[in-house]
Amino acid sequence: MSNQLPVINLMGPTASGKTALACELYERGNFELISVDSALVYKDMDIGTAKPTREEQELYPHHLIDIITPLEVYSAAQFVEDACALIDEMHSRGKTPILVGGTMLYFKALLEGLSSNLPSADANVRAAIEEKAANEGWQAVYDELVAVDPAAGVKFKVSDKQRIIRALEVYRITGQPITKLQAEQPKNVPYRYTFHNYALLPDRLELHQRIEQRLSKMWDIGFLSEVESLIEKYDLDENLPSMRSVGYRQALEFLLKSDMSLKKKQEMEDKALFATRQLAKRQYTWLRSLQEIHDFKTYLTIKQAKEDLRNSYG
């Protein structure tokens, strides 16, 4: 592994303070920022994603923000391709990349590589799977997967809709189970980089308080109006990856129903809060699984992280 191409990975659950920390590092050294967030890639989705404002992006430019519309799909494979191109370009200019975000699948793909010969997503195959789910229910789709790929059935739950879709998509295209292909196929790992991995893992109670504060601010500054504007501008539906983002899923469901009473609005806000907490829980799980394989330095507080990283990088 070459020591000539260092890459700083700054990870953490939602609302942990990682973006603010990355911006502070940016000010102190010869760095550039790359967003590792599957929601920030979407244009016009600003409030619900806690996207850095235009003013903040002018001060701290982020790559891989606002690159597609909410109608488009962005995969982990595309992220790795884009991120590696940016990393190489930054190093050619003498910059050190800081990758910051909470989409752990993207970090995992960058650190461990992706199976190189799996088929690309097929919109028609996916539409057929989603149509079956709409007509027969997700249990029927899950049962189909278990029948052709029992190992995937052990790994996935019925609620893992995107993973089920991908596994069935691969089987319908190739005729082979995705678990078999993943075990057999080589992975493309960017060995030319030296990754320096850092993770913010604050106390759960503190994180839950930060999440509540973020969502409260989100409602106050017009998140529902933002989703209404999205509905007017785009032909949205709940199956789009963009609309499966926490907050947007609950808001879209609320706005598309006839009953928009205060009671239903409160229920929607409660669902969004619960979904965000569940997201943070999954991010913790992902981080801990990555830590079992890769070298990490973890911090329990933002203050601790700032002091240590200042000493290391500025």
From Swiss-Prot:
Residues reported in the UniProt entry to bind substrate: T14, A15, S16, G17, K18, T19
Function, as annotated: Catalyzes the transfer of a dimethylallyl group onto the adenine at position 37 in tRNAs that read codons beginning with uridine, leading to the formation of N6-(dimethylallyl)adenosine (i(6)A).
Domain of life: Bacteria
Binding annotation for ATP: G12, P13, T14, A15, S16, G17, K18, T19
EC id: 2.5.1.75
Protein name (database record): tRNA dimethylallyltransferase
Marked site positions, Interaction with substrate tRNA: T103, R126
Keywords tagged on the record: ATP-binding, Magnesium, Nucleotide-binding, Transferase, tRNA processing
Annotated spans, Interaction with substrate tRNA: 37-40, 162-166
Membrane-crossing residue ranges in chain numbering: none
InterPro entries reported in the protein's UniProt record: Dimethylallyltransferase, IPT, P-loop_NTPase
Pfam families: IPPT
UniProt similarity note: Belongs to the IPP transferase family.
Gene Ontology terms describing biological process: tRNA modification
Lineage: Bacteria, Pseudomonadati, Pseudomonadota, Gammaproteobacteria, Moraxellales
Record text on subunit structure and interactions: Monomer.
GO molecular function, one term: ATP binding
Signal peptide: none
